[in-house]
Amino acid sequence: MFSGSNSYLGGNTGRQPPQQPQQQYGGFQPNQGFQPQQTGFQPQQTGFQPQPTGYGNAAPLQPNFTGYPLQPQPTGYSQPSQAGFPGGQQQQQQFNNAPQQQNFQTGAPPIPQIPQQFQQPQQTQQAQPPPAPPVQQPQATGFAAMADSFKPAAAEPSKPRGRRASKGGAKIPSIRLSFITAQDQAKFETLFKSAVGDGQTLSGEKSRDLLLRSKLDGNSLSQIWTLADTTRSGQLHFPEFALAMYLCNLKLVGKQLPSVLPDVIKNEVSSMVDIINFAIDDDAPAATNAPSFDGRQNTATPPTIQQPQPMASNSALLTAQMTGYPGQQNNFSGGFQPQQTGFQGQMQTGFSGQQGGLQPQPTGYNQMSNPQATGYNGPRPPMPPMPSNFSSHLSPAQTGMQGGMIAPLNSQPTGVDGQWGLVNAPAPNIDLLHSRMMPQQGREQGNFTTAGITGNAEIPWGITKDEKTRYDSVFKAWDGFGKGYISGDVAIEVFGQSGLPKPDLERVWTLADHGNKGKLNMDEFAVAMHLIYRKLNGYPLPAQLPPALIPPSTRNFNDSIGAVKSLLHQESNFRKNSGATLLPQKTGVSYLKNHSFRGDATPGRTGRKDATVYKNNDDDVGYKSSARRRLGASSPRPSSPGSTTSNDDLSLDQLRKKIAERQVILDAIDFKAENAADEDDALDRKDRREAEDLYHRIRRIQEDIDAHPDASLRNVDSGAERRALKRQLQTLTDKLPDIASRVRRTERSIADAKLELFRLKDAKAHPGSASSIVGTGPGGAITESDRLKARAKAMMQQRSAALTGKKIEASNDDLDAPKRLEEENLKIRTEKENNERMVQDVEESVRDFSRGLEDSLKDGGESSSSEHEKRRWEDGLGVEDEVKDFIFDLQRSSRSARVRTDDRSRETPRTEASHASPAPAARSETPSSQPSSTPTPAGGSYSQYKTPEDRAAYIKQQAEKRMAERLAALGIKAPSKSGETTQQRLEREKNERAAKLRQAEEEDAKREAERQARIAEEQGAPPPAPEQPKETAKKPPPPPSRKAARSDASERKAEEERIINEQKAQIIATNELEDDAQRQEAELAKEREAAQARVKALEDQMKAGKLKKEEEKKKRKALQAETKQQEARLAAQRAEIEAAQARERELQRQLEAIDDSDSSDDDEGPEQVTPQASTPTQGSQELERKEPSPPPPPPSIPVVVSPVPAIATTTSLPSPTPQVTSPVVSPPVDTETRNPFLKKMAQSGDASTASTASNNPFHRLPAQELSTPAPIQVQPTGNRPSRVRPEEDDWDVVGSDKEDDSSDDEGPGAGGARHLASILFGTMAPPRPLSSMGNEATSAPESPAVASPPAATPPPPPVPNFNAPPPPPMPSAGAPGGPPPPPPPPPGMGAPPPPPMPPMGGAPAPPAGVRPAGLLGEIQMGRSLKKTQTKDKSSAAVAGRVLD
């Protein structure tokens, strides 16, 4: 709101003519010191023509009352004039209700009296702040009536013109404000329209009345007004009014008002205010007494002037000025300064960059200080400048002083065609369009509409800088690969999001794709987006692209191409016309006038050669080729330092001399070449030797790696293993908070239970004390309400006692009970806090440990260089063919060794279990099994620690130990312990190194034994004899320790039981962690196997196309054929010695029968004195398949039979527990077997199921079975009758594991699917008699031995010499009374029954339904049974059968 108003000019002619206010744009400082100027001798017939009051970019101006408030009068003439530059916006002041002023005879309009506030002497040079004017009406600022301004005034206003017709009332754009909701905005619009009426702004008084309804205090309303009035005009546009309502709501809900508006809200409000001001239509001017200039009027069609855009939103209003007095302006930046009118030489308004104030100019004669009469008949006032032409550019006209200093001006784009990216008009809905056109999900459906992005804003042809920035961001978002263009298919998707119909999008593409390239660059994409933007705001698409939208790149590119074409055309014509087409290479003369295509004929540049002339200058180079000059001897050879004359001038002697010299040189060259060749050969031989040596060393290292105990770990993908370990570590770490919370809950429960127990005990000890009060407070505390209840209860008891006559003993302990309870509560709380600190310490230590593990896993990650080296030296990528073949050969040998290791590892668990099965006494003497069975002496047991701190430290120590062991097994170094001293760490590392050294020595010994056995097998001879003492010396230590262990067996047993009982708490605490770790290890093993399978498949694929593979296949086939032939020869040899071994077998059976009868009543478990290393044979019935293990602690009497000439046997008796074992018989000392059944079974083993596989082509040879007594292996690696020895081991080990400590029978460890099946199906049916086997005979059948044994057994009948099926498996320990079902016998084989097993003295009585022992005795005596013809071989080897 303006603080002052201008007065109307009065009716006396002695006063100054009116002064039109003129805006001085861009400044806030008032121009002081303007003196009233004289009007000169101008005839004032029709008044003064109004002059331009602003610049082309001026914001819309508001009307100002410049006279008395009660009778508004026009200050000049409402016909605006042309400012003289394109895009200039004229200001117009009109009042439809202004009455016509009378024309006096003087020709000048009557001047009203000067208001009181302006009656000052004219000599006053100081500016006065004008008072506040009355309510002002909005001023139209369009260009519709610009051309009509030069015509005679009409009697009534013309109708509005422009793109949209004028409507009554406030014009509010359809733009959503983001800081209020749509419903609130609709309500505010209704309220604003009802309050503003036909105007566009809400005055300060009305705004005050509306804001006072909010009941807010004056300070808040003042702050709200300051924030809302963004234009500082004293009036509110609709967005400002909505902002004021929004701020009032913030204050009403209790929020603080912001000191400064946020940029988003401020920009939205300012932009909408500018749009409202620019959208105001121009109305027709009111009738005035302006003179008619018909004679000088330009009748041509006025040009179409581009709508200018505002530079700032706060320069929208005029500053009211006194028209007749200088200095009547305020400090508002958008105000106009008073300017004298009527002088021809006015200032030019179409340029920028000048500074300084406007100097008032006289309108008549210069320096006239006295007012002049208005009736002077001189020249008329100058007509306002008209446009000089109506082309695309308008000529500026002079409107002020030539060369005068003006206020700083900002250069504004005029909107003329060809201007690119310089328009600064507000861009409504551009944010919505930008967000719509960006890549978004769901765009594949294509269901886009124009809802939400359409509008009716006025948009110029030119693209604004803000729009160009947004279009470029959309382009870059879709051009993900940075190609610099967008193809047609992408453009369909982008432009389709606008919702425009397909024909419009086709026209947009046609207009934007300059040159029909099928793709759009960044500028062309901006053009297309701008066309879409205009179309969404109601503008039609043009038929052709206007010059304003032609991208500079396209325009400049076409111009540059045209310039180059023109240059080439001109140069070609010049050469053709001037004869310059002659070859300058021959003439050496350039026929061009200039040495440059640019036509720069500078005399100083004539010596410089360029592309116009080319002539090679041989002097500029250091080498000259004379070969081309020697052809035909047309020119002499150029001189050289070594030859001054030609060969023709030399004499014969000279020529001979030169030939001899050349011959000497050639001989020297040949000699040097021979020496070099010899040296190269020597170097090649040396390199070959070194390479062979390296190959050999690499092979040895690879063999050592394959034979290492941790060789299986290196085949695992380290990355996958590391990720699996990280996942396992994360899983365990995630469980820590839950475990800690459960511990804390348990501690709280314990504390509550202890407190409750104390209350009960205290109440029992002091029946009448106050401790009987039950506390209901937190933690069982007694509250005041509990005491009141107790007192009321006591009073009731006293009253009831008084009524009944009973006596109530008064308690004196009322004060002591709370004290005792408080002491106990404090004690319990202290203990609870101590436990909580311990739990926190454990949590922190576990977290530190997990962080250390995670860091170690991260540090061991593979880099790109290591990955490259791995692919090069393991996959053979990027190396020579010879090296690649060597790598593949190493991999093949490594896989073979790994398969052999896997075969041995399958038997290792059972062997270790056989060592771990004896009593604790024997276990304590075994170094290998001692760590797993007895606790570490340094660690102690869980029960040894009495305090919670010690127990927590013990649990932590054990957990760290187990984790370190697992990490060591995986090949990861465990992080150092924070609480471990240097001495302890050195001691621990020393022990670890010693253990690893012992293990490595044992593994080396095993590998050496296997290698010797393998060599012996390949040579077809039995193993060397010196190995037997070695193995014997290796195995026997357990038996000698038997007596020493038996001496303190009871003590160790008691200690073991006590330790087991004490470790229950620790087992409970760590059981869950170990189960999870085992599960993770199982998953890791599966992943490792999968990775190995993938690697193996990849290797097989790489080798598939190799020629060497075919050669290897041929060699393998030949080797297999040779193996089969050798097996055939060995089978024939075995058949020849079968007869010689029959007698040996009979003597062996008799000896076993005698041994069994002698030891039938002994309770001692099976014992084997002779080590397994001396019993390598496996085919006979009498051989025991298990490793020697420490004897049990109970006293046992082993029956050692004196050796016969060919056999030394040791029979072990079964224990009284229901365990079925078989006797053990040692073979001859010389380890050479002559058992024909062993060889028969080796031949028939092809039809049986092999427990392990082997890659050895000689696996069927008996020599291998004879010479592979691995120290920890139970079975040889070759094929053999697989249903004899594993099942015997299974029976023994299960029995020894499952029975009590009193039954300490030996037996190797067993496991696997067959063992489990024998346990499951061994007891499902009653025992089957041996008659189901038919009349077959087997070389080594295992008798079930479940019937009551006789005192002695007769010698077995002779056994026919033919191949027989393998024996049935031994029953498991879980089924003591039932024998396993026999395997299906082959058809057509009738033979006496097999010899029986020695009787088991301690076997229990058979269960009900079992056949009597007499039948078994008859069968053992040789009774013939019915022949069977069963041919079904599909059942499993250990499948059960249902008997009738």
From Swiss-Prot:
A GO biological-process term: endocytosis
Compositional bias of kind Acidic residues: 1153-1166, 1287-1307
Gene Ontology molecular function: actin binding; calcium ion binding
Coiled coil: 685-763, 980-1157
Membrane-topology annotation of the record: Peripheral membrane protein
GO CC terms: actin cortical patch; endosome membrane; plasma membrane
Domain EF-hand span(s) in chain numbering: 216-251, 500-535
Entry keyword DNA damage: no
Keywords, comma-separated and alphabetical: Actin-binding, Cell membrane, Coiled coil, Cytoplasm, Cytoskeleton, Endocytosis, Endosome, Membrane, Repeat
Record-annotated disulphide pairs: none
UniProt key word DNA-binding: no
Biased composition (Polar residues): 1169-1181, 1245-1257
Compositional bias of kind Basic and acidic residues: 607-622, 806-875, 899-913, 947-965, 985-1017, 1045-1061, 1076-1113, 1135-1149
Chief site of localization: membrane
Domain spans labelled WH2: 1411-1428
Subcellular localization, as worded in the UniProt entry: Cell membrane; Endosome membrane; Cytoplasm, Cytoskeleton, Actin patch
Biased composition (Low complexity): 14-56, 78-105, 114-127, 297-309, 632-646, 914-937, 1198-1230, 1339-1350
Region (Disordered): 1-140, 289-309, 594-651, 797-1444
Biased composition (Pro residues): 1351-1409
Quaternary structure and partners: Component of the PAN1 actin cytoskeleton-regulatory complex.
Described function: Component of the PAN1 actin cytoskeleton-regulatory complex required for the internalization of endosomes during actin-coupled endocytosis. The complex links the site of endocytosis to the cell membrane-associated actin cytoskeleton. Mediates uptake of external molecules and vacuolar degradation of plasma membrane proteins. Plays a role in the proper organization of the cell membrane-associated actin cytoskeleton and promotes its destabilization.
Family: Belongs to the PAN1 family.
Name of the protein described by the UniProt record: Actin cytoskeleton-regulatory complex protein pan1
Source organism per UniProt: Botryotinia fuckeliana (strain B05.10) (Noble rot fungus)
